């Protein structure tokens, strides 16, 4: 049976699973769908065309599904889609998409979103991502699986953050971080491969060694980006555990529109 506090407001039209719990003074809008076993903290607002999957935990005073902070927005019925098993802590803001992009902001599964985080319109957050307190994502940011964003960091619009990468606290990021790379600073600069994170996630010693070699090619050998990509492609065909991650690195660089941190 759904447990809705008597002071909460659930507007007609909202689709709420019977196992959902909604705390005091929370507000759920008419176009919201909330999946099984999700809990909504007190004073939170879930609005817009927002879909929450199963087993999510929304902290107190969170604002989920609000209008995008984009002056071009004209009340189009854009969406926010959130997967399963996400923790979204107090005072976080997550906005719906815009028609200038694909119209949907997405958050995958098993993400840990700490207090006061902002996820702007049209962002695409993968799975198992950690966004530390006060990390701020502008619009259209893409974050790959298992990435970690340090607290008090700011990420420019349209920036891409690769899978298994890490951005240090209080950083300002204006270009893409390739997968597996650690970056920090204002403006953010590369500081090596995320070796400890890769070990924790089961990457082999050979794969990590190949990524370290790729990092040296990309950042330490004095090569232009085009020269480095030639050597990276050769490294990706070495015939070992490192082929797949190095290939992913090259493909990410090839797809970059803003350029990568250098």
From Swiss-Prot:
This is Acyl-[acyl-carrier-protein]--UDP-N-acetylglucosamine O-acyltransferase. The keyword Lipid metabolism applies. Pathway: Glycolipid biosynthesis; lipid IV(A) biosynthesis; lipid IV(A) from (3R)-3-hydroxytetradecanoyl-[acyl-carrier-protein] and UDP-N-acetyl-alpha-D-glucosamine: step 1/6. GO terms for cellular component: cytoplasm; membrane. Belongs to the transferase hexapeptide repeat family. LpxA subfamily. Its EC number is 2.3.1.129. It is an enzyme of class 2 (transferase). It comes from Burkholderia cenocepacia (strain HI2424). Homotrimer. Keywords: Acyltransferase, Cytoplasm, Lipid A biosynthesis, Lipid biosynthesis, Lipid metabolism, Repeat, Transferase. Pfam families: Acetyltransf_11, Hexapep. Involved in the biosynthesis of lipid A, a phosphorylated glycolipid that anchors the lipopolysaccharide to the outer membrane of the cell. It comes from the Bacteria. It catalyses: a (3R)-hydroxyacyl-[ACP] + UDP-N-acetyl-alpha-D-glucosamine = a UDP-3-O-[(3R)-3-hydroxyacyl]-N-acetyl-alpha-D-glucosamine + holo-[ACP]. GO terms for biological process: lipid A biosynthetic process. It is found in: Cytoplasm. GO terms for molecular function: acyl-[acyl-carrier-protein]-UDP-N-acetylglucosamine O-acyltransferase activity.
